[in-house]
Each structure stands twice: as structure tokens, then as C-alpha cells.
Amino acid sequence: MIRYTFIVATVAATLLAVASRAVAQAVPATPLFQTLLQDPLYRKAKAAALAFQRKSWEQGIVGTAFLEAGDDETVIALARASLIYPTKDGLIAGVGGATVDPLMFGESLWHAADVTKDPALRKAADTMLDFTLNKAPRAADGTIFHTGQTIWSDSFNTSPPFLAYAGKYDQAVQQIEGHWKRLWDPQAKLIAHQWNEAANRFSSKTPWGGGNGWAAAGITRVIRYLPADHQADRDKLIAHLKDLLDGCIAHQRPDGLFNDTVNDPKSFVETDTAQMLAYSIYESVRGGWLDKSYLTAADKMRAAARGKVDDAGFVQGVATAPTFDKPGVSPEGQAFFLMMEAAHAKLVQETK
């Protein structure tokens, strides 16, 4: 029995090693990722990101960070690891959170399935898309609920980028528009945090910095994914993004950061909003739909955020997990540092 167990274990280890070598050969490091790894701060922040215990949306945004960096090896590993936590709806990465939170992993999962041709990943990706299109609870106009019958600013970064990445462009735009019409506060010129559809009113009108960052990041990627024959939709989303960025930048602190409630200087100073907005600006300037004048604000954000990375690679001062009610650390904070750095590196490389 011992000998049999040893043989089985040896064979399994051999197969795993072969599979690992195959993946490594199939996904060589991109020039962008090689450039990022030359920065000690990036390497530390990456290690810290992977050290966190993560819930579904956290796994999702960490996956996006490595997808944005061209680090396919890590994206594929995260996707395969997420298969062990299915939800009752058949979604993966189902560790805590709201109904739509696993959708934040959609882009990475779809990409991993395409790259590896792994049947298990393909099935998981197709199941997630079917859920998003047909089964996720939603309002009468099709806008997907975050939890219960509420719509949150966080969800700008769940279903819309995934739908666009999977080629469902009209549905992605529909989700952005449905969230925008409920959550955009034209008086504050900021995104409110939560809308209660059943009560037809805000359940939280607070312009949370993280929520505005989620919105900017999600809209940015949808714009990037939309093809040329969706120019009218692109123009509409670009206008939303500019309004959002202008509204936030009006409240940027002299140190480059923002308060946790964007328009309330009495709320604590928070790091992640700056990273999220800087990422959005760098990507948008690189994409050509945002003027270079925004780089002044983005560079201040980036400099401030880089100054918040501690010796272990943790980005300090973000709205802390799991309560988000005080400064601390979080997987989101790590992810958006990495995304900001990747977007900045792409912009620098392409403007040399």
C-alpha cells in the first residue's frame, strides 16, 4: 500500500511538473512584465498582493492586475486556483461577498481559458458569461444588482469590463449606463455609493473614494475594449469618464491623495483612490481619449502612492480590508498599485 501510494504520488508530481513546464513555455514573460520586474517596489507589491487571503472580488482585481501587466503565468495560476471555490450558481472564486463579486474575475478567467484551452477553465468562463447575461438578478431595465435590490458603485468594475472583454459590447455599455443614471450625482459631480432600486432612492449618497475609483477603472477598460464600430458608445463613455475624473480631481489634496469621502476633508486620507484614478488616466491618455493635461494630476497621485509602500511591499493608507472604515491595507490596494504601475509603464514605453 505504501509503495502504491508512493508511485501514485510520484506520477502525480511528474504530471504536475510537466504541466507547469508546458504552461511556462506557453506563456513567456512579456517585455512589459520584464520591465515592471526591474522595479524593486513592484516586485515587493506583487509578493504582498499574493500573500493576502482573498475573497471573490479581491481575487478578481488581483487577477486583473496581472492581466494588465502581461503576467499570464500568474493569471492562469489564479484562475486554476479559483476553480476549487464554486458558488451555487456555478461561478468560481466564490469566497464571500455579493452575488456579482465573482464577475470581477471574468476578464482574467476568459483570458486564461483562451490561452490554455483548458476545458475546465473554458467551462467556468462560459458559465460565468451565461450567468451575467441571463441569470444575475437585475432591475427592470437590465441593470444587474450588486446585492439584494441595490446597485453599487463597485459594480462598474464587475460585469461591464467582463462583458466587453468577452465581446458582449452592447450589454457592457448597457450596464455602465444603468449604473451611471442611478449613481452619478450631478450636484456633487461624483459617483454616489449605493442605490436602492426597490425604494427608488440612494441608500448611500456618500461619494466614497473607492467607489469613484472602481467606476473610473471599469469605464476605462470598457472604452478600451469597444471596437471602432461602437464609436458612439465610446464617445458617451468617454464623456462620463471625463466628468468623473474632473469631479474627483477638483478635490485632490496638495499631497496628491484624496479623502476617503472625496468631498469631505474631515474623512481620513486614503491611498487607493489615487492609484485607481492614476491607472485610469494613464490608460486613457495612452488610448488617446484623454488629454495629456491630466498627467499632472496622475503623476502626483502616483508619486504619493509609491511613497506609501512599506518595506514588505504593502501599500499603506488604503481603506482597510475587510471593513473599509479606516486606513490600512487591502488586496485592492495592492492590485491597483500594480495596475497603476503597469499603465504608467505602457504609457512611457509607447511615448518614447
Language-model features: locations:
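Residue-level signal for well-ordered alpha-helical scaffold segments within enzymatic catalytic domains
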Residues: 4, 65-68, 107, 111, ...
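Bacterial N-terminal signal peptides
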Residues: 8-17
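Bacterial N-terminal signal peptides that target proteins for export
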Residues: 1-9
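Extended ligand-binding groove/face enriched in aromatic
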Residues: 76, 85-198, 203-205, 311
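Sec/Tat signal peptide C-region and signal peptidase I cleavage site
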Residues: 20-24
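Compositionally biased, low-complexity linear motifs
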Residues: 4, 73-74, 207, 213
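CBM-like carbohydrate-recognition segments
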Residues: 26-106, 112-127, 131, 135, ...
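Extended ligand-binding clefts on enzyme/binding-domain cores
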Residues: 150-154, 160-262, 267-278, 292-318, ...
